[in-house]
Each structure stands twice: as structure tokens, then as C-alpha cells.
């Protein structure tokens, strides 16, 4: 199978090899050293500021989103949620579940956030802003710099979910004044799913220390204290953390975060150029490098997903909900190159010849 899904993605041979090894015991100095290296690489790649920290949670990225909501906010806050798809809605749902007042800035599916729309909420008493910098369900990439300026002007605590955009699109945490960055192991980190990463600015570290959170597993202050010695409070996904270490070193060896972003960008541009004459419309007004969301003009999107899987050995990523039959997504993350794009192109051309596209 050729994997154009958005996670898990195709792993490099080096990362796969680590997954085939026996999982070692982890309460050791050697594992602590590896975890501290993981933290330093992450802080370097997201361009975090002085005093920033990172922790690694054994959970899906939604678990990290929930941990941030629980540990950084309370019923005394008033949050603005950028809600342009299913993952923006997830932030809104988490706020509701934890009884934290929140207002959704709703965007039409696939539309970018403009400064005019954002500044309708200027000076309205908000204390925090939550955004999926890349909205995975639509492929839209929001302007993090514009959002950061808005947060500075209004003194908002700024939370950035970069689960699929980290390492695929440019992001400098300190430059955009983000207080929290969230990402996951199965996107551009190109490792198996199961580990989420939370990066804290110095301000966020202090905020978490003061927050009373009624949770043991999702207590981020406890996570931060343990990570000081390169450990976790509970048994982590040891094998995946070893694979993350291998992958982070792989990125460094290949020229660092800038080169990785360029590589993903080339992959996205190559795909979009190759399919420009096929009967699709592009969904996103401001597309991320990480994925291309496609609307088939004459075919059922979910049927195409099934045909590609069953007859061509190709995975793309179907949408759910109202977009199930109208949109599917093609990922550009992981160990893919132009040759894989060409294979997908030929499959789509064949479907067109068969009258199925």
C-alpha cells in the first residue's frame, strides 16, 4: 500500500528499524538522556524562546488538547476558539465539557481567517485564544503571526495546535508569541501514533505551576517536573519515544527544520501541479503544505477513497460528517516523494478513463 493518509504516515526505514527492536527498560540514565535530547530538538525545531519547555504525553493529540485546556484555563476565563472545521470544534467541545466559557469564531469550510473577521472580537474581554494553526479537516493554514499580534494586543494566552502543520509549514513559536504548541507523533514527525508533544513558553510554565487541576494523568505540572530529569510520571510509549529520537536526528542530519519544511512544500507543489487538469476543485483558500483537500466535480469522494484502496493499493484520507461524499484529502507527509505522486496521478487518470472520476 502507498500511504497518502494524514497519520499514521509512511515511516522511514530507519524509524521502522527501531520499531522492530525489543523495548528497553526506561527508568535509566540512558533513557533520561535521550528524552532530554528529544526535548531540546523539539524546542529548536519550533523556535521556542528562552525558558521554554516540552513534555511528551502518551496519548493522542486530543489528549494533549484536553490537558492544555484543563491545565491552562478555568471557569474564570473567556476563550476565543477559531472554529473552521472538526478540530476547531474539538477545542470548543473541550471547553464546554470542562465548563470554561468560550466563543467560537465560526468559519465556512475551507475559508481562511481574515484580519477583518478576527478583529470583530477585538477588545471583547477574552483571556485566551485557541487555534488549530493547520485545520486538518480542511487543509486550511491560518496566519499564526496575525493571530499572535491580536493576542498581544488583547493580552490573550495563545494556544496553537500544530498537530499536522509542525515540520510541514513554517512556524516560529517565539516570533508569533505562542504560549503553548501542541503536536503529535504520527504527522510530520512520521512516527507511529501514541505520543503527543506539548511545548510551553516560560510564561506558560509559570501558569501551569499555579493552576489547580483535578487530574492525575493529565497534570502538566507533574509532567514538567519529571521531564526535568528526562522522565515521565507514568509508563510512556517507550518504543515510540525511541523512534521520535531517531526521526529528530534524521531531520537534523538532513539540514534541520527549514529543509524539512522545504521538502514537504516541494511534495505538495508537485502533487498539485500534476493533478491540475483533473476534475477537482481545491478546497482550501490558504492551503498548508501538509495536505491537499480535494472536491471531485463529478464523483463521490468516499467512493474514490474506496476504489483507490481496493483496486490500486493507495490510501488517501476520507472526510467525515457532511463532507464525507464531497471531499477527500491527500497528505504530503512522511517518506513520500514525487514518484509516489505520479503513481497516485496515474490511478486517478485511470479512474477518469473508466468514467469513475
What does each of the following model-derived ranges do?
Residues 1, 322, 326-357:
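PLP-dependent enzyme catalytic core of the Aspartate aminotransferase-like
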Residues 1-29:
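N-terminal "arm"/small-domain region of PLP-dependent enzymes with the aminotransferase-like
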Residues 10-11, 186-269:
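Active-site C-terminal subdomain of aminotransferase-like
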Residues 19-67, 86, 90, 94:
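Conserved N-terminal alpha-helix of the aminotransferase class I/II PLP-enzyme fold
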Residues 41-45, 248-282, 307:
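Conserved PLP-dependent catalytic core of the aminotransferase class-I/II
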Residues 73-88:
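Conserved PLP-anchoring active-site segment centered on the Schiff-base-forming lysine
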Residues 112-167:
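Active-site phosphate-binding strand-loop segment of PLP-dependent enzymes
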Residues 280-311:
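Conserved PLP-binding catalytic core of the aspartate aminotransferase-like
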Amino acid at each position: 500500500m502507498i500511504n497518502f493518509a494524514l497519520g499514521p504516515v509512511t515511516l522511514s526505514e530507519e524509524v521502522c528499524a527501531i520499531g522492530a527492536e525489543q523495548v528497553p527498560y526506561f527508568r535509566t540514565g540512558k533513557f533520561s538522556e535521550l528524552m532530554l535530547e528529544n526535548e531540546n530538538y523539539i524546542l529548536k525545531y519550533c523556535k521556542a524562546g528562552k525558558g521554554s519547555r516540552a513534555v511528551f504525553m502518551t496519548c493522542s493529540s486530543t489528549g494533549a488538547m484536553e490537558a492544555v485546556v484543563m491545565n491552562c484555563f478555568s471557569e474564570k476565563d473567556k476563550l476565543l476558539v477559531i472554529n473552521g472545521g472538526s478540530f476547531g470544534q474539538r477545542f470548543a467541545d473541550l471547553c464546554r465539557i470542562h465548563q470554561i466559557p468560550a466563543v467560537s469564531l465560526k468559519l465556512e469550510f475551507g475559508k481562511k481567517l481574515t484580519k477583518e473577521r478576527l478583529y470583530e472580537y477585538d477588545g471583547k474581554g477574552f483571556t485566551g485564544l485557541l487555534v488549530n494553526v493547520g485545520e486538518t479537516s480542511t487543509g486550511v493554514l491560518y496566519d499564526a503571526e496575525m493571530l499572535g499580534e491580536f493576542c498581544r494586543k488583547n493580552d490573550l494566552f495563545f494556544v496553537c495546535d500544530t498537530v499536522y502543520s509542525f515540520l510541514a509549514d513554517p512556524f516560529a513559536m517565539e516570533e508569533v508569541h505562542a504560549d503553548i504548541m501542541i503536536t503529535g507523533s504520527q504527522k510530520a514527525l512520521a512516527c507511529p501514533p501514541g505520543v503527543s508533544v506539548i511545548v510551553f513558553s516560560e510564561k506558560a510554565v509559570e501558569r501551569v505551576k499555579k493552576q489547580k487541576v483535578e487530574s492525575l494523568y493529565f497534570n502538566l505540572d507533574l509532567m514538567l517536573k519529571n521531564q526535568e530529569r528526562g522522565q515521565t510520571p507514568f509508563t510512556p510509549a517507550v518504543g515510540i519515544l525511541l523512534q521520535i529520537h531517531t526521526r529528530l536526528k534524521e531531520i537534523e542530519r538532513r539540514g534541520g527544520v527549514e529543509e524539512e519544511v522545504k521538502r514537504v512544500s516541494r511534495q505538495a507543489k508537485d502533487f498539485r501541479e500534476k493533478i491540475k487538469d483533473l476534475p477537482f476543485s481545491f478546497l482550501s483558500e490558504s492551503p498548508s503544505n501538509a495536505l491537499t483537500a480535494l472536491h471531485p466535480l463529478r464523483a463521490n469522494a468516499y467512493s474514490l477513497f474506496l476504489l483507490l484502496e481496493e483496486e490500486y493499493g493507495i490510501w488517501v484520507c476520507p472526510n467525515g460528517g457532511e463532507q464525507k461524499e464531497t471531499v477527500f484529502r491527500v497528505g504530503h507527509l512522511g517518506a513520500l516523494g514525487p514518484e509516489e505522486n505520479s503513481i497516485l496521478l496515474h490511478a486517478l487518470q485511470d479512474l477518469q478513463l473508466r468514467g469513475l472520476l
